[in-house]
Amino acid sequence: MTDAEQREAARQFANKWKGRGREDEDGRSYWIDFLSNVLGMANVTDRVEFEKKVVVDGNTKRIDVYIPETHVLIEQKSLGKALDQKIMNSGSVELTPYDQAKRYNDNLPYNEKARWIITSNFSDIWIYDMNARVPEAVKISLGEIPGKYPLLDILIKKDVQKIFHEMEVSIKAGDIVGLLYEAFLK
């Protein structure tokens, strides 16, 4: 897929999911759509684990989305849920979506630990680099995905080390290609 095709797929994805998003009903479709149609991942359902079981304090919990080959753990919330506020979870513990994901990650076997944690509420995607001493969210809104989708290459590429420096050039190049593509369409 060319950059222009990916950008267009990202635009269509953003338009399709604007104003939609129920955690239980739409979470799986959202990520399958993004991984396959925007990032071009083949055989998504064979390569991604949905509702992966993890035992926390003796209770079985479920990780919404886990991508084993890139060690990405995704905690999905419904549209409108704030990603920076504590929410009462099924264990009657108030945690932010990141804290909930980190708790799951802390209870995974060492070889399955997340390299990246993502929290999402359908309108926002926050990425945390678990190699950072103090992980801070890189925030992408749904409307920004057409210009910033390369930041989400962490979902499919094992070799991404940081998402700021190496992606900045790619995003700028993508912006230029996108402008050229749009100019040719006129």
Model-derived regions: residue spans:
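Broad hydrophobic/π-residue packing in well-ordered secondary structure
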Residues: 30, 39-43, 65, 104, ...
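Short, solvent-exposed loop/turn elements at beta->coil junctions and helix N-caps
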Residues: 49-56
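Short, basic/polar, glycine-containing "phosphate-handling" surface segments that engage DNA
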Residues: 1-18, 56-59, 63, 70-72, ...
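Acidic-basic catalytic patches of nuclease active cores, encompassing PD-(D/E)XK
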Residues: 14-49
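Central hydrophobic cores of alpha-helical transmembrane segments in multi-pass inner-membrane proteins
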Residues: 34, 39, 67, 72-74
